[in-house]
């Protein structure tokens, strides 16, 4: 239902002559409004990797509003507490500077080429390294990631 809602919202916003940036942001939030957000650093890093900091914070607000609007059991305080905890974890992850993008990895495309990778294999390996770092941020050091890549070269098509 999220994909259909996002597509419909995009059309409505276009008909209402909203600017492209606003349309993109709103459609993205609607498309992700069913994503599971937890007060867990790994979950938060994944959301930040998917959406970026601004959109992740907006998504928290959208989810709070959505859940409170559907709150049939009178759980408003629990909902607000949960999303305050999620916001705190976002603050902690951002303050620590945890890696949440390929660009922020301690290695890059040049390192992959030096190891013999080319084309799509570079992106695949960097994305796999990001997945590792989202789970274990302490792995985001040049030497650790290069060793990890060397150990996983056979899993990647050069």
For the regions a protein language model found, what residue spans apply to each?
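Divalent metal-dependent catalytic cores for phosphoryl transfer on phosphate-bearing substrates
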Residues: 1-84
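Charged substrate- and nucleic-acid-binding regions of tRNA-handling and nucleotidyl-transfer enzymes
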Residues: 9-17, 71-158
């Amino acid at each position: 239902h999220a994909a259909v809602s996002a597509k419909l919202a995009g059309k409505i916003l276009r008909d209402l002559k909203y600017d492209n940036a606003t349309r993109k942001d709103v459609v993205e939030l609607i498309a992700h409004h069913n994503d599971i957000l937890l007060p867990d650093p790994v979950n938060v890093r994944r959301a930040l990797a998917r959406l970026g900091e601004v959109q992740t914070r907006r998504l928290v607000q959208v989810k709070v509003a959505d859940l409170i609007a559907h709150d049939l059991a009178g759980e408003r305080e629990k909902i607000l507490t949960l999303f305050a905890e999620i916001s705190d974890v976002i603050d902690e992850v951002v303050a620590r500077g945890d890696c949440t993008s390929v660009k922020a990895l301690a290695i890059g495309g040049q390192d992959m080429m030096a190891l013999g990778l080319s084309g799509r294999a570079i992106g695949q390996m960097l994305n796999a390294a990001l997945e590792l770092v989202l789970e274990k941020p302490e792995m985001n050091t040049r030497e650790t990631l290069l060793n990890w890549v060397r150990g996983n070269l056979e899993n990647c098509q050069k």
